[in-house]
Amino acid sequence: MAAGIGTIAHGNDIGGSLRWPAHCNGVVTIKPTQGRVPAYNESAAAERPMPAHLMSAQGPLARSVGDVRLALEAMSQRDPRDPWWVPAPLVGPKPKGPIKVALAKLPDDMDVDASVHAALRQAADALERSGYRVSEVEVPDISGVWQTWCDIITNETVVLQEA
């Protein structure tokens, strides 16, 4: 798709399988909220365990945001074989005030290239000029989350392989 062979592609994401390839290949994606896109898999040997349902998401990849939106709308249609699907609208009511955006302050011990800092500031400035309210926030300590996530994924993978 990034090479121009197709316009829209489908993928799934637990730990970045949509987002990282899109980032590395200069294309656009979104990891939809769980339940937005049906995830029924007729070829699966067994139903996926609940944590796999809660972490995995089906989503589109495309060369433009407009194509991703079009694909997401098509992919979000009801499939009665997926009990996790929810009828969430793609567009909600117009906000009553400015949309709030949190710009995470990077921890002092995190080594981040100056170009990344500049890009984040540039994005925040562009959002503010577009009417968004950008506030810097402290990042909570989530150091233990990564190990917990890895434990869950590892156990889920074992269960799926044994099915």
Where are these regions (language model features)?
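Generic structural signal for helix capping and beta-alpha/helix-loop junctions
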Residues: 17-18, 111, 144
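Conserved catalytic cores of soluble enzyme domains
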Residues: 19-36
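Short low-complexity, flexible loop/linker segments enriched in glycine and/or proline
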Residues: 23-27, 148-154
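Short helix-loop capping/hinge segments that flank enzyme active sites or metal/cofactor-binding pockets
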Residues: 95-104, 152-163
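General small-molecule cofactor/ligand-binding pocket signal
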Residues: 133-138
